[in-house]
Amino acid sequence: MKNWLPVMALTFVIVSCSNEKKTMKEMNPFYETYTAPFGVPPFDKIENKHYLPAFKEAISRHEREIEQIVANSAKPDFANTIEAMDKSGELLNRVSNVFFNVKEANTNDSIDQIAEVVAPLLSQHNDAVNMNDKLFAKVKVVDDQKDKLNLTREQARLLEETYKRFVRGGANLPADKKEIFKKINTDLSLLELKFGNNMLAETNGFKLVIDKKEDLAGLPETVVVAAAEEAKTNKMDGKWIFSLQKPSWIPFLTYSQKRDLREKLYKAMYNRSNNNNEFDNKSVINKIVNLRLQKANLLGFESWAAYVLDDCMAKTPKNVYDLIGKVWTPGLKRAKEEAKDMQDMIVREGGKFKLESWDWWFYSEKVRKEKYDLNEEEVRPYFELNKVREGAFTVANKLYGLTFKQLQNIPLYHPDCQVFEVDDKDGSLIGILYMDFFPRASKKGGAWMNNYRDQYHYEGQADVRPVVSNTFNFSKPAGDKPALLNFDEVETLFHEFGHGLHGLLTKCHYRTLSGTSVARDFVELPSQVMEHWAVEPEVLKMYAKHYKTGETIPQKLVDKIIKAGKFNQGFITTEFLAAAILDMDYHTITKAEEIDVEKFEKNSMEKAGLIPEIIPRYRSTYFNHVFPGGYSSGYYSYIWAEVLDADAFEAFLEKGNIFDQEVATSFRKNVLEMGGTEEAMKEYVNFRGKTPGIEPLLKNRGLN
């Protein structure tokens, strides 16, 4: 069974009449075999009223499956215990995958209410499984005899991961501590849900309304048109609205000549859920941090970070801080140089003010234009969304022989979605890929990959192929122009598509190990390595076509992009690592305490030496990755994986061919297809033939 219990979830009135219950059960699409093409979820049939009954039935069904494993009188072995557990929970996986994906991408009040009921239900059920003494006793019997069972590598790995999940889930705790552990998990499930809901409410709650045309000075036409359309949507015709969605606030901060308005929008962005109102997250953070510490202590770890990292490649907080330090020092040095360049420009222009954090985007863009004669708006017309998407598909075709066919008449959870059939070079089905591109009030911010169906292939049964989703928040079409991406968005598309390939190309027997079920600091390797192809001149010429003329991006412009590729890397590196440090500082606390969140963050950044012109990429109260998300004590993973991805791409460069088939096949076989069937570093060494060093990362960022 997969780690299928995302801790979130619901309020719904359940019909009490037995006949009505029977009717609801019969009509609930989750209980039927999906009949839509390729077995994708029947979004056209699923209604909010179906979720809670389906969750309750799925939990009940899974309980019965666990009881059957426990009641089996045969001697515990791999098949009747470990594999049986992996096979269990099919309905719960199905319901959870749909519900939580929709919760993130297209939520509403009803779904949010449902989530509040389901979160504790799932937490309690998860604990009931992990702390089932009779079940764990059977797992221990199998683990004790593992050397005599002649297990395959994958079977041995599944046994290892299953045993570890029980131990890390509290199975070895005494009865009284188990009850405390369960209560902590239930409380955390609700707090993490509340954090995310608060952040979404704050993000949606702010609008910068502009009613004077002169206040639009400096903004590109596409940005102005999009703001006018947003105002029209909000029944404010003749005005312009800028929001806290990235495609809105980033271009405003980059191009607006109105410094006071840049400051207003920026402060609204970085003060989300820090406004001492009903959506404030400071007390939520306090509770989450202290409950996590208490949970780690119960399991014998001195801090939450020590607990989390024990199951990662990094292993210890010290190793994480050491890596951060190696990149932080040159990154901060470069950031100070960049800040000086911008302050010098302010002085040259007659400015009488000091560079502030809300000035960075504006002046860095001006410096880029001055140094490299490159304006982001100059390249945007060459990055039409559908062409960029096709570029990513072409890279996958050249590397792995994959083909992508857009499907029509497929059930969608939102009209913005596109769906693709992905086939291998021999024509066999690889899987189905959903892509959801644009921001909306019902969608959380950021970009991510999830599964609607995991891949697995049990002995003697058909290979179940995955249904994968890539979700984004890209710039929408504006006026008569299609969706035109900036280069950051181009890299984001390639990044999430890399995650998608990891989920699609997996070839595992067991659901628990398939796809992205790998160490957290390894999971970003397939995504980040894909970003390298996005900027390769050979690839740019495949997809970067002017949306009006069809002209391929000129070599002169490609040269500018490459030359400016390391521009602003001090800022990019430092703001990211500042957030990683903040995450680690919260989660290396070893003593329960009342945390003054603002003071804690200030002290953390001062200790690290962060300059005042830069704030962490995510401040505490909207740090969605680590408080409700799955990256607590793990935001460093992106830089850890960058050590791997920079070294991995070097393997192609060493061959003189970015599409070298020998290297691509090795990466597919040893990384993408393997899922979590092998220890992460072993997978990497099997591909690369050596462990990675940090030098390629520093070189890529221009920090060497």
Language-model segments: which ranges?
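Short His/Asp/Glu-rich catalytic/ion-coordination signatures at enzyme active sites or charged loops
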Residues: T35-H50, F99-V118, V141-K183, S243-S283, ...
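N-terminal helix-rich structural modules
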Residues: T23-L219
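Sec-dependent signal peptide recognition
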Residues: K2-M8
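C-terminal, non-catalytic "cap/extension" segments appended to globular domains
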Residues: T23-H50, E57, A217, K239-W240, ...
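C-terminal motif of bacterial Sec signal peptides marking the signal peptidase cleavage site
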Residues: V15-S16
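Short pre-active-site segment immediately N-terminal to the catalytic Zn-binding motif
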Residues: S475-F494
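Short, hydrophobic/amphipathic alpha-helical patches that form generic packing surfaces
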Residues: L91-N101, E160, K164, K267, ...
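Active-site-proximal, well-structured secondary-structure segments within enzyme catalytic domains
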Residues: L158, L190, N197, A201-S243, ...
